[in-house]
Amino acid sequence: MGRGSKMIDLEALPHLPGCYLFKDEEGIVLYVGKAKDLKKRVSSYFQKRDHDPKTASLMQFARGLDFIVTNTEVEAFLLENTLIKKHWPRYNIMLKDSKRYACIHLTGEKFPRIRIARKNTGEGEFFGPFVSARERDYIFEVVRKTFQLRTCRKMPSRACLRYHIGACSGPCISSVSVEEYGEKVKKAISVLKGNIRELIESMETEMKEMAAKQMFEQAMELRDEIAALEYLQEKQNMERQKKYDEDILNYIVRDNNVYLMLFKVYKGTLEDKQDFVFAFGEDFLEEFLVQYYSENDPPEELIVPEPLDESLVEFLAHVKGKKVKVAVPKQGDKKELLDLVLKNVEIGFFGDRKKLEALQSKLSLPKIPNVIECFDISHLSGTATVGSMVQFRGGRPDKHNYRRFKIESVEGIDDFASIAEVVRRRYSRLLEDKHEMPDLIIIDGGKGQLSSAFQELRKLRVKVPIISIAKREEEIYVPGLKSPLPIKKDEKASLFVQEIRDEAHRFAINYNRLLRQKALIQK
C-alpha cells in the first residue's frame, strides 16, 4: 500500500520492508530508497545531524514522503530500480555509463528511421540493449549505411546531405517507394535479429541473378552490402563467444565523490573495464550494484572490497536466475585482482588530481575544483552565432553534461552580450532546477568577456569562482584585477585551463558547422 502527505509523517511508517520516495514541495520525486524496515530507515534521516553533502541537500528540499510496502527486501530492491527508472530522481545515482546499454530502434513510421534509444518505449522495434557501446555503434552504422535508412527526426521537404553522398535512400523526395523502403527495413530487422547468414545467402542469390541480367551496378551494390554483413557476422560471433565469469569492483571515496571502477575478467584475462563517478551517499555501493546489475547480467562471481548484505546477494541471484558467489578476499590471487582495480582507480582518476591541485593553488580556490564548466562563443561573420559549455569532472571531460546554446537575444557580432546570455541561461536553469553549481567557471576570452559573465552571476547571486583565459598569451584573468595572474602559460595549471578552453572551442565550432550545413541544405 502507499501513503503520501505534504508533511512528512513518521508515525505513519510501518516496521516493514519497502520503498520510500522523498518529494519536493511540487510533488516531484527527489530520491527513491529501499529499506528492510521503513520506519527505522526513514527516521534515521531526521535523527542524524552529520549528513554527507548529498543527503543534507536532499533533506533541505524534501517536503513530502510516499512509501510502498513489499513482502520481502528482495522485492524492495526490484521495486526500487523500477521507481528510479520511472522518476529519474536527481538525488539517486544516475550511472553516466548507462548510455552504453542503449538499444537500436527502428521506428514505426511509414518510412521507419533508425536511431539509438536509451529507453525501449514507443512504436516500432527495439534491438538490444548492447553491453558494448562499440559493438552497438558499429552494428548501427553498418545497418544504416548498408540499407540506406533515414535518421532524420522529421522528413525534410528536400533532399539532405546524406542523400547526396549515398548514405540515405531519400524517401523525403520519393526517391524510393514505400514497398522498396519496406524491403530495406525487413533486411535491417533480419540483421538486427541475428539472422545474418540467411540474409547473406538470399542476397548472394539475388546478386547472381542481377549479374546474369547484366544489371552490374545493382549486383555490385549487393556485393558491397554482402561484404559489410559478412564482416559484421564475423565480428558478432567473436563478441558472443565471450563469457565473463568474474567482476571485480573497487573504489575510492574522496571530496564527497565516489570514484569506482569495474573490471570484467574471463579466465584470468581482462576483457572490459568501466569507470563511474557519482556523489557519495549512504549505501552508495548497494545502490550502484542494484542499478548496474538491473541492466547487466551478474557474473558467476563478484569480487568486492567489503561484505554485501544478504538481501542484496539474493537480489543478484534473482536477476541472474542462479546463485552469484560474492567474495571479499583478504589474500591470494583474488586479493591481488582487487588491489589491481584499486591501483587503476588511483591512476585513472587521480592522475589528473595534480592538475586540479595545481589549479586550486594558483587560483587560491577554497576547494579542489572537481566540477569545472567552460564557455565559448563561435560565429562566422556574425551569422550562426552559438555558445558552448563543456564540463570537466575530476579532471576529465564529462560529455554527458555538455551543453549547446543558440544565441537568441543578440544580433550581429557581440561576444560580450553573447557570453552574458549563455551564462545567464545556464545558471538560472541550475537555480530553477535546484541543481548544484560547479566549483569553477572558465570563460574563453579576455577581461571584457569575463566582466560580462561575472555581472550575470552577480545578478543571479551565484557565488562561484570565475576566470577567463585570453588566447594570445594564454593570460588568465580574475574579476577585480586589471592585470592577468602571474601564471606562466607552460605551467601545469595554465595547461589544464588551456585544455578545457580548447575542448569548449572545439565543441562550439562543431555546433556552428552543423548549423551552417543545415542552413545550406535548406537553401
Swiss-Prot record:
- Cite the InterPro entries for this sequence: GIY-YIG_endonuc, GIY-YIG_endonuc_sf, GIY-YIG_UvrC_Cho, UVR_dom, UVR_dom_sf, UvrABC_protein_C, UvrC, UvrC_RNase_H_dom
Q: Where is the GIY-YIG domain?
A: 15-93
GO annotation, biological process: nucleotide-excision repair; SOS response
A Pfam family annotated for this UniProt entry: UvrC_RNaseH
Protein location: Cytoplasm
Q: Which SMART domains match?
A: GIYc
Which terms does the record give in the GO molecular function aspect?
DNA binding; excinuclease ABC activity
What is this protein for, i.e. what is its function?
The UvrABC repair system catalyzes the recognition and processing of DNA lesions. UvrC both incises the 5' and 3' sides of the lesion. The N-terminal half is responsible for the 3' incision and the C-terminal half is responsible for the 5' incision.
Name of the protein in its database record:
UvrABC system protein C
Organism, per UniProt? Answer: Methanosarcina mazei (strain ATCC BAA-159 / DSM 3647 / Goe1 / Go1 / JCM 11833 / OCM 88) (Methanosarcina frisia)
